[in-house]
Amino acid sequence: MNDLLLEEQQVRVDLAAMFRLTHHFGWDDTIWNHITARAPGTEHNFFMHRFGHSYDEVCASNLIKVDEEGTVVDGPKDLNTAGFIIHSAIHLNHPNHKFVFHAHPKSASAATAFEEIPHFIQDSSMLYGKVGYHDWEGLSVDPDERHRIAENMGEGGLLVMRNHGFLTAGATAGECFMKMYYLIRMCEVALQVTSSSLKVKNGSPELWQRASKQYEAFSPGLYEWPALLRKCDRLDPSYKF
């Protein structure tokens, strides 16, 4: 197997692991939502799951490959159109982001109705000033929406799609996954705190900014992803095949 095929297989395995871990953490929504990865050796082709498969069914071998026009070039022709629109927005406009993750987790989606999601705990400081917002435009089936999604996300790889869900992107599977992990965690805490009648203590913008800079020394997913892959192996190693 040549180097390109080996690289492609590793991307497939990492992407399949993201699906299985999303199911494990309870962030999936039956067959809906989507996670994608740019195919090595191509400029705009990317892998996504076959429409109709639940996340616990996804494995490296049953992913499909899609080109920039939305044509399935490898695998069955079962394509989620909204998934293609949302993910191609990032793959076409942010080449530094190789993995893209869209989710509507039940525990956090209510926070997408906030004008802006407040920060309350240490973990969310790593996202301070890095989260973009995109207003809901109805179902994401209009190709014209792609440039607005890409512009609103910016280079931070974090986007709250208001009244809809969340979108994260990263150079690696681990970075992309852990951005989603911390974004969901931030929203869960925000919902819990804002539902309380107790007086809230919060830090100053200067403190949040300083903590955000401190977190830049830690790359999301660098240490967590190997541990998450080991967890995936213990849960069900069939994702690799």
Model-based region annotation:
Residues M1-F241:
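Glycine-rich flexible loops
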